[in-house]
């Protein structure tokens, strides 16, 4: 199977923090993009420098990671609103503030709100505001799906992998449980 390659595609840099695992992912991305004629260099930064560079938007592509603060999908979604301190992708900020290329239609949810060629604040921020203010669980989850669709359609966020926790547990241990967030609790456990 022939692979078409881009020509005259601008080179880019992938920013990541120091870790053999993060470097390996960067090398994989570099190799995968090279197959399409895209040149990507890798830039490694120490953790604090990396965080500052990312927060200031001083990158083309950067590694990001997130673990939920609490067991609710909004923990992964509200970080991308314009005013969020975790919005390192710079959605709705600075040069992107007036970028009107997003669309949202909430009429199928019974909400009289439809915008085309709108800003991030008029679409994503608005939807997240509704998620945080509604008391109806079904509407709340439907709105979170709308927000997720906006985020994924932007192309700026690309989930690559999820962390997993592998552990061994003796069959003699009773009462230990794990939360969906990956925390292991032993306060009610004992050995048979």
Question: Residue spans of the language-model regions?
Answer:
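Append "and occasionally in soluble cytosolic enzymes with long acidic Gly/Pro-rich linkers
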Residues: 1-31, 35, 146
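Solvent-exposed loop/turn segments at secondary-structure junctions
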Residues: 18-22, 47-49, 67-71, 149-150, ...
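Solvent-exposed, polar/charged alpha-helical surfaces in well-ordered, non-transmembrane soluble domains
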Residues: 24-35, 48, 52, 122-129, ...
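Periplasmic-binding protein-like
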Residues: 25, 150-159
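Periplasmic binding protein-like
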Residues: 34-93
């Amino acid at each position: 199977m022939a692979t078409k390659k881009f020509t005259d595609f601008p080179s880019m840099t992938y920013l990541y923090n120091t870790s053999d695992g993060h470097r390996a992912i960067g090398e994989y991305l570099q190799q995968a993009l090279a197959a399409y004629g895209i040149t990507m260099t890798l830039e490694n930064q120490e953790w604090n420098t990396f965080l500052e560079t990312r927060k200031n938007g001083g990158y083309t592509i950067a590694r990001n990671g997130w673990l939920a603060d609490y067991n609710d999908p909004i923990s992964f979604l509200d970080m991308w609103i314009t005013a969020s301190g975790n919005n390192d992708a710079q959605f709705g900020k600075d040069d992107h503030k007036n970028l009107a290329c997003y669309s949202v239609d909430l009429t199928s949810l019974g909400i009289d709100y439809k915008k085309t060629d709108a800003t991030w604040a008029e679409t994503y921020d608005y939807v997240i505001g509704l998620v945080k203010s509604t008391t109806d669980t079904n509407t709340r989850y439907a709105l979170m799906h709308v927000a997720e669709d906006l985020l994924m359609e932007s192309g700026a966020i690309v989930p690559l992998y999820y962390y997993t926790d592998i552990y061994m547990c003796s069959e003699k241990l009773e009462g230990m449980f794990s939360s969906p967030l990956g925390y292991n609790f032993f306060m009610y456990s004992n050995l048979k």
